[in-house]
């Protein structure tokens, strides 16, 4: 039709503009040498490439082809003071691209960057607020361990990652979802499995060219599965929320002390709409996944260093020997804190830190020009630097306890939740992990129960090597351990 005769020309202009935009971005990034020819090399040996890039380019910036956009520019750790608190470097936008934001089924990863999630954490999961939650968390930890690890006093084999994530999911859900859902099997199945399913779907999706993502995901079984999980999650949460809203309409003074209610309060305070299922799964991603990884790896490290078990048990007995939780109880488990921080130093969840997307052109003090929309990250190698840590590749459960006892500054920087340029386990600066206080609290609390109430050792021929994928370094999901119930006289 004559009225539509302009359409081919318009499409040609749009295509030409897109090609020119991509070409211009590539030209701006050409100043950074690319360390790998294909994204498969990044996916298979990301950490090795970082070491090679550091050696080949002598600490100067280089680029990793990740298969997404222009890849990631790896910067020298010396620029951390410039990047850590500069709003022109956005961690949320970096993660959104990595996790296929905008593709149906991955909405919880968009929720990770929403203001309402950060406000719910900031307003409710403060160190002071978390201390008040220890009693219900402890009660659920006790019940979850008994149900999942059993009270069998004979050695029996379990898949470590499977049992720990189920325990952490139940304990966290007490605070996230309250009594109605914290033991709901269908909901717990979703919270336990969603992240792994989404990660697998993302892996499959990344095999395709980026421009096909929005089409091909509809036909991939892995992507269909995560979409179905979100539908089910919404169906589970909706009636609980509707019931609560009716009850609160009848009695405005009614309060629920969980994240379902915190979101309702925050949404009214901020005058925004939100998707409860997306937000709850975002909380699960930020808390359950990282807590499970840290706890699983810590248990493996302790099993390889069994001389640590009894000193840890003695500390726990001295702190909560009377069975009473106090606001300072977990703060005083300083050896346990040190053990966890050492595990996080040796095996963080990623071999890079400070992943950011540049929201406008930036020129660093050393003259490095970072174009808008480029992705950047910093090699986390400082955590294994012999100039900073003595015998950095050797596990030392007392390392951070000694640093805390050595100086006032060490007390501030050597706690598990502390962030510093020398330890990027929880990030750094304005984008440091906001949920680290709750996550660390949950891990320490569950570990107190586990260490006092169970013996644990690695199964024969257990594989404890981390699972590496790109820059990710995850606790091995195939590791098997032997556990048995201990006869412990502390009742808490």
Predicted regions located by residue number:
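N-terminal membrane-proximal hinge/A-helix region immediately C-terminal to the signal-anchor transmembrane segment
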Residues: 3-114, 422
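Conserved cytochrome P450 K-helix E-x-x-R motif and the immediately C-terminal K′/meander segment
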Residues: 42-51, 322-368, 378-383, 387
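C-terminal helix/juxtamembrane-tail motif
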Residues: 1-4, 15, 368-369, 471-492
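Central I-helix of cytochrome P450 enzymes
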Residues: 237, 261-317, 343, 377, ...
